[in-house]
């Protein structure tokens, strides 16, 4: 069977509407690594009503495989006051295919923040080797505030959800007003809940779920933002982390403004690589026979589109659109070149293919969510801001003037995307975090997996996480393109990760693999789709982790 890359699934998707399965059951974990981090730190048995409940599993929907089961458990909104308001946590499972060989449970997270994880067991069932399916019950959750787990909303319009905005002197005042309005609307619609939609609380939910399932430890496969969730879990509950695979990693020290800014920093070497790639194939693509000439061709088209937007298949594409789209596209030079050639054709009045622009204008996946009945249309964006602003409000300046200065400076340093990354965001007007940021510095063993050319979590980000997790090992895929590594059909990476999941033994030292032509071709193919064939969850979201 042809394998497809199980890349980070960064968008809400309800293309297959999951019938709500309402079971009010939960449990509390045993003592954690510290009283401050443990749900069981509650006094006087306040979590007893959770510990005595059990999930009531039911088939998720008639059209889904019978083994794909769903339930809903209850968790405290505020772990400091577990006797107060409770919220739903939607969970799913596919049980081990070899009960006699079962090791435990493998929880997964697709990324985001704001990505639904309830469908992950279905995707993993198709992609993981049979030996792993025998070893684990596959567990999925919609993190708190997301999807079926008491979804939050800010009642944002589609225009208000558009948050990667280039800096322009003449529009900055409007951008500040937009950022303030988003923060105000979020407070108005979900103010009582949003302060508790954080990664630390989601990690506590994961540990509570571990106890509900009757497991002493939990294994984990997290992509992109999911690597940060996994790292925070190991910090709060190091003794309960079993086999942790962190694919396409976030640097905890840069959560979250620094990670957005890393999109701009990481794009510059990728852009230079692209100009060299295109120049070496000038006879095919005609963009210039030296990197300098390709660079000039690119910026000339940006300038033309800023003066007169390019019209293609009903789209009007500005120079800012080209810069923003190219930021992610250049990490796959072939896809970027093909897309740019079509833009140039359209600008020159020639017939062009809008389909080839998919690598350029990849969907954030909100379309399916807008058709859903029970999930607010802006849920992914609302939950994204709750986490990105609420995890570490200290990372976000409060003075709009600081954003203006940073955007101007970073556009100079990183001309492709610097102003997009550093300009004003709603976090400037967000309430202060209820807890301090999580410093990840522990000895829980984890396996970090990272492509060299990743548009969302650059290689230095994974290297930083590897340094913070003292007993971790890292698999680096030299020449690897795309966001998300495992499984990819690459014998080196797949063998290392699967071996760890099956045995629990980390490699003796960090591992370096080389990308294969097939795995990079799949990355390019996936980049040009809005969703992976056969998956209910869209593949790409260029404005998420």
Describe each PLM feature range:
Residues 116, 204, 222-234:
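Glycine-rich nucleophile elbow surrounding the catalytic serine of serine-hydrolase chemistry
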């Amino acid at each position: 069977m042809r394998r497809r890359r199980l890349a980070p699934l960064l968008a809400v998707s309800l293309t297959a509407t999951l019938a709500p399965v309402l079971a009010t059951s939960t449990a509390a974990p045993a003592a954690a690594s510290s009283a401050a981090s443990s749900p069981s730190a509650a006094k006087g048995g306040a979590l007893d009503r959770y510990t005595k409940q059990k999930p009531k599993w039911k088939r998720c929907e008639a059209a889904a495989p019978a083994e794909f089961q769903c339930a809903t458990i209850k968790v405290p909104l505020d772990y400091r006051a577990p006797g107060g308001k409770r919220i739903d946590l939607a969970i799913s499972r596919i049980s081990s295919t070899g009960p006699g060989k079962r090791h435990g449970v493998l929880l997964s997270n697709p990324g985001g923040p704001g990505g639904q994880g309830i469908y992950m067991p279905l995707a993993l069932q198709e992609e993981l080797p049979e030996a792993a399916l025998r070893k684990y019950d596959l567990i999925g959750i919609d993190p708190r505030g997301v999807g079926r787990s008491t979804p939050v909303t800010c009642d944002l319009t589609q225009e208000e959800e558009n948050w990667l905005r280039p800096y322009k002197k003449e529009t900055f005042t409007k951008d500040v007003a937009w950022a303030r309005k988003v923060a105000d609307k979020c407070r108005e619609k979900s103010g009582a809940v949003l302060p508790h939609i954080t990664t630390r609380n989601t990690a506590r939910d994961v540990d509570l779920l571990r106890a509900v399932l009757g497991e002493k430890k939990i294994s984990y496969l997290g992509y992109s933002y999911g690597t940060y969730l996994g790292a925070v879990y190991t910090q709060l509950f190091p003794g309960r982390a079993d086999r942790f695979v962190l694919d396409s990693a976030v640097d905890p020290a840069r959560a979250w403004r620094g990670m957005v800014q890393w999109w701009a920093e990481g794009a510059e070497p990728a852009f230079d690589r692209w100009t060299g790639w295109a120049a070496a194939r000038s006879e095919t693509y005609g963009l210039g026979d030296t990197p300098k000439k390709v660079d000039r061709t690119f910026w000339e088209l940006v300038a033309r589109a800023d003066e007169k937007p390019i019209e293609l298949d009903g789209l009007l594409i500005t120079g800012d659109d080209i810069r923003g789209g190219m930021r992610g596209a250049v990490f796959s030079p072939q896809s970027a070149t093909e897309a740019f050639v079509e833009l140039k054709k359209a600008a020159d009045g020639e017939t062009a293919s809008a389909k080839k622009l998919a690598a350029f204008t990849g969907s954030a996946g909100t379309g399916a969510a807008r058709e859903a009945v029970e999930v607010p249309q802006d849920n992914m964006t609302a939950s994204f801001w709750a986490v990105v602003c609420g995890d570490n409000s200290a990372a976000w300046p409060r003075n709009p003037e600081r954003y203006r200065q940073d955007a101007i400076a970073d556009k100079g340093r990183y001309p492709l995307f610097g102003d997009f990354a550093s300009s004003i965001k709603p976090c400037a007007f967000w309430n202060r975090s209820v807890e301090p940021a999580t410093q990840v510095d522990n000895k829980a063993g984890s396996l970090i997996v990272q492509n060299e050319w990743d548009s969302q979590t650059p290689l230095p980000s994974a290297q930083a996480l590897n340094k913070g997790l003292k007993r971790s090992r890292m698999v680096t895929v030299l020449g690897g393109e795309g966001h998300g590594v495992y499984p990819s059909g690459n014998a080196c990476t797949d063998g290392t990760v699967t071996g760890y999941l099956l045995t629990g033994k980390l490699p003796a030292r960090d591992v370096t693999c080389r990308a294969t032509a097939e795995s990079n071709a799949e990355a390019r193919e996936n980049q040009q789709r809005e969703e992976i064939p056969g998956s209910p969850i869209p593949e790409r979201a260029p404005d998420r982790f």
